[in-house]
């Protein structure tokens, strides 16, 4: 799907696409960071499992495409908030973005506004550069923004309350990335897609707890 503009094509729940994408669920390069930043160990947040992936996708974006700025702490969205208390992180959504191809100048790299996850004031240029349906918007010209360049195989980790978007791709070819979003076990799926039985049967016990921590639904009188 897409968001109705020029953000490229998303292939949702990409962990269904085979073993390479299954390995990303608990990849050793970042799984311990996710456990640390989502937090919640020995609390209700771990009642169903250590983490939950509510959405994961591959994104393909061509020339002239971009995604406008979005998120940011001033929006106050509980789904993706940032919190640090008593020496521990409690973040509702933490993203890992993996570059499948090199992303350099002109390739439409991810753009972030550093420290915006801690801000209580909206960026003064936010409304001009935010995502807009049926209209191209990008974030590379925002004051204080930082475009992130990646080599193929690099992974970028950030809390979703960080204000972020992308630059417009001006080079030929396609920008190809994969994104996995992690949060506490009580979360639920963003879109109406559920993991297949085939996938769940292939995963390790730890992976299944991350992909589908929810218990079997108990229906009254059945």
Language-model region placement:
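Non-heme Fe(II)-dependent double-stranded beta-helix
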Residues: 1-81
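Double-stranded beta-helix
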Residues: 90-93, 103-163
